[in-house]
């Protein structure tokens, strides 16, 4: 299933990415030259891949047995990475809501929870992803308001014939943040619900044969 492949990539890339970033930041902080920074970055990636290889090789690692605190850290890590990579544009962070909903449904399905517990868990993960999205939107708004060129950049980007005022920026930030917050909640909710039902139907079909 493509969903399982995506989860394996998401969880499998954590260690290599952390190692890469640690080596890169270390080189930058000591004021190394470009060639040393590049060499350090590649070395960090290779080191991370080697570590990941031995983790997987042991065969004791299961993404569905990770602690909730670890899952939260991984989610926040990717949210920050995407926020930085896409230069503070939060729309790309919406993808993590669906991934989280899919993962949480798969994690719970084997426990066969009752309807009350299932509803509570679905709400928990949906609220969590929405809150993280809210924080991402706040960060995006903060950087937008602290950058004196934001208004001019928006005017040029969208070829506007009028000046962008602070009031407009505030309105767009509030409206956009609210839309992203609600969208993330429902994306997570829908992904969870659809995944859980599909897994149940698949299980029933398998058992009936």
Where are these regions (language model features)?
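Short, membrane-exposed interhelical loops at transmembrane-helix boundaries
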Residues: 151-171
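Membrane-helix interface motif
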Residues: 25-26, 140-155
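Hydrophobic alpha-helical membrane-insertion segments
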Residues: 124-142
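Membrane-interface helix-boundary motifs at transmembrane edges
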Residues: 56-68, 114-120
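Membrane-helix interface and helix-disruption motif detector
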Residues: 24-40, 63-64, 82-92
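Alpha-helical transmembrane segments
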Residues: 7-21, 74-76
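Hydrophobic alpha-helical transmembrane segments
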Residues: 164-187
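Alpha-helical transmembrane segments and their immediate interhelical/interface regions
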Residues: 46-57, 82-110
């Amino acid at each position: 299933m493509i969903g399982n492949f995506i989860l394996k990539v998401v969880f499998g890339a954590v260690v290599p990415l952390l190692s890469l970033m640690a080596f890169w930041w270390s080189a930058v902080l000591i004021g190394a030259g470009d060639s040393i920074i590049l060499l350090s970055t590649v070395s960090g990636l290779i080191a991370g891949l080697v570590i990941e290889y031995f983790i997987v090789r042991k065969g004791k690692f299961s993404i569905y047995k990770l602690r909730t605190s670890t899952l939260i850290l991984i989610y926040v890590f990717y949210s920050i990475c995407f926020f930085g990579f896409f230069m503070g544009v939060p729309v790309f962070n919406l993808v993590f809501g669906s991934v989280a909903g899919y993962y949480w449904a798969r994690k719970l399905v084997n426990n066969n929870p009752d309807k009350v517990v299932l509803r509570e868990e679905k709400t928990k993960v949906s609220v969590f992803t929405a809150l993280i999205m809210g924080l991402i939107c706040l960060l995006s708004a903060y950087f937008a308001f602290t950058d004196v060129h934001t208004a001019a950049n928006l005017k040029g980007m969208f070829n506007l014939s009028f000046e962008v005022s602070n009031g407009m920026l505030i309105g767009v930030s509030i409206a956009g943040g609210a839309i992203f917050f609600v969208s993330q909640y429902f994306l997570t909710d829908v992904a969870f619900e659809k995944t859980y039902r599909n897994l149940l139907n698949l299980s029933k079909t398998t058992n009936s044969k």
